[in-house]
């Protein structure tokens, strides 16, 4: 609990919400974070797991947690909202999680940021796909690292698309860092 209450931000994924005891721990962590003034972000994590659990049940486990940032991919957004249109998905997610900054990961189409009722499309940073493993997680982590320092969701999404592009141009979810990645990440400090 001390680590959470001393933190500025807590990131949760839906993998924590599918069963107990992780579900109870994640809910408690989000509550502690908010009580201590930290922000909380959420990545729905798996459209298949949401479908298996049932959308209504899934939302009942997390909709009341007042997430500050929600980072679904398009498939997760489709399952949560029933829409195929990225703008409608983002608006639907914003209705599910009122007040949250919504960053919709669009795979080969980049990302869509919905902040303060304004949409900004961020184009993809590459079209050279080698392996998409880890792209969404690298996007989310990069977005949060940049946004929590610079407080610009659009610039954070641009940064995240560049880091995710670097990831998908390599094999595996954790490619070895190189000079290009060092240059990309040096802007976060």
What are the residue ranges of the model-derived segments?
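Conserved beta-alpha-beta core of the PfkB/ribokinase-like small-molecule kinase fold
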Residues: 9-92, 109-110
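Short amphipathic alpha-helix with an adjacent loop that forms part of the alpha/beta core around
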Residues: 1-5
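A short small-residue
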Residues: 6-9, 141
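Conserved phosphate-binding/catalytic region of the ribokinase-like
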Residues: 31-35, 82-189
